[in-house]
Amino acid sequence: MARYRLGRINEEVKKEISNIIRDDIHDPRLTGMVSVTRVEVTNDLRYAKVFISIFGSDESKTETLEALKSSAGFIRREVGHRVKLRYTPEILLELDESIEHGMHINDLLSNLKEKKRNDNR
């Protein structure tokens, strides 16, 4: 499959899953702020690995991820209705820590810059 087509499919599935999580899932366990950071659909369109970033405590992250995993069948069905593909991919949800990792590195750099500024005084 052409690389650019797979990229378009990834983005379309990502957009629809974001909309589904935001508008259609009414699970009380969804306590943290949830964002879909990226989606990787396999070449045969059978599986979609969905990377989710959850802002909140570790406990709320675990609870929110479990709520989303229990809603995976609903999400798959809705994606099948909204995105016209030969196969509706099976949704595999994974926690994405990259945003928090980036924030941690940014804090470290800020601390170094502040320390350097204080040492020069």
UniProtKB/Swiss-Prot annotation:
The keyword Glycoprotein does not apply. Belongs to the RbfA family. GO terms for molecular function: ribosomal small subunit binding. GO terms for biological process: maturation of SSU-rRNA. It comes from the Bacteria. One of its GO terms (cellular component) is cytosol. One of several proteins that assist in the late maturation steps of the functional core of the 30S ribosomal subunit. Associates with free 30S ribosomal subunits (but not with 30S subunits that are part of 70S ribosomes or polysomes). Required for efficient processing of 16S rRNA. May interact with the 5'-terminal helix region of 16S rRNA. It is found in: Cytoplasm. Its main location: cytoplasm. This is Ribosome-binding factor A. Keywords: Cytoplasm, Ribosome biogenesis. Monomer. Binds 30S ribosomal subunits, but not 50S ribosomal subunits or 70S ribosomes. Pfam families: RBFA.
